[in-house]
């Protein structure tokens, strides 16, 4: 599986601004589904 850091580095574009903000706030669970929709190997 891909690490959280690697997954966060893959999140680019305006549609993921909220996702990045949640990760910075430590709300990884809120971001996890969105990450997995883009990169199935991402594990949160």
Curated annotation (Swiss-Prot):
InterPro entries in the cross-refs: Bifun_inhib/LTP/seed_sf
A GO molecular function held by the record: nutrient reservoir activity
Keywords of this entry: Antimicrobial, Disulfide bond, Fungicide, Seed storage protein, Storage protein
Disulfide bonds: 7-42, 19-31
GO biological process, one term: killing of cells of another organism
Biological function: This is a 2S seed storage protein. Has antifungal activity. Inhibits spore germination in H.sativum (IC(50)=62.5 ug/ml) and P.betae (IC(50)=62.5 ug/ml). Inhibits growth of H.sativum, V.albo-atrum and P.infestans.
Subunit-level organization: The mature protein consists of a small and a large chain linked by 2 disulfide bonds.
Similarity annotation: Belongs to the 2S seed storage albumins family.
Protein name: 2S seed storage albumin protein
Organism: Taraxacum officinale
């Amino acid at each position: 599986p891909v690490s959280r850091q690697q997954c966060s580095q893959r999140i680019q574009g305006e549609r993921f601004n909220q996702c990045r903000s949640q990760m910075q706030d430590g709300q990884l669970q809120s971001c996890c589904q969105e990450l997995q929709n883009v990169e199935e190997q991402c594990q949160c």
